[in-house]
């Protein structure tokens, strides 16, 4: 019985470690963590370390499909990049990441690739309806 319990525990630990490794290796996760998590949180729940000082507070990013489609669309990418600003509220409160990424990455193509990785990552963490 003790051997069985040890085997079950070892299996559970291995499965948990594999799940964490898979989560860390999701394409775009590193980009999300670098550019988005300070405001939107590591879990994309809107509770990043600076969220409390921002007005309006950053939204959770785990239920975007209703607004941006399934899979997440070009519309979301253009919003993140700053290509499209929301008209109802004037300028976006979010940084214009397209400009930031172009300056940092050195080209429009490299910036676009980073944005698409982030959008694909966000698509992978959407809460199922």
Where are the regions that the model predicts?
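Positively charged n-region of N-terminal signal peptides that target proteins for export
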Residues: 1-4
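Bacterial N-terminal signal peptides
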Residues: 6-16
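Sec/Tat signal peptide C-region and signal peptidase I cleavage site
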Residues: 17-21
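Periplasmic/extracellular electron-transfer cofactor-ligation site
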Residues: 23-24, 29-56, 67, 82-92, ...
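Extracytoplasmic/secreted proteins, especially bacterial periplasmic and envelope-associated proteins
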Residues: 27, 31, 71, 75, ...
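Gly/Gly-Pro-rich "capping" loops immediately C-terminal to redox-active cysteine motifs
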Residues: 29, 45-77, 99-107
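Axial heme c-ligation environment in periplasmic c-type cytochrome domains
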Residues: 58-59, 81-113
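A mid-sequence interfacial segment
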Residues: 106-129
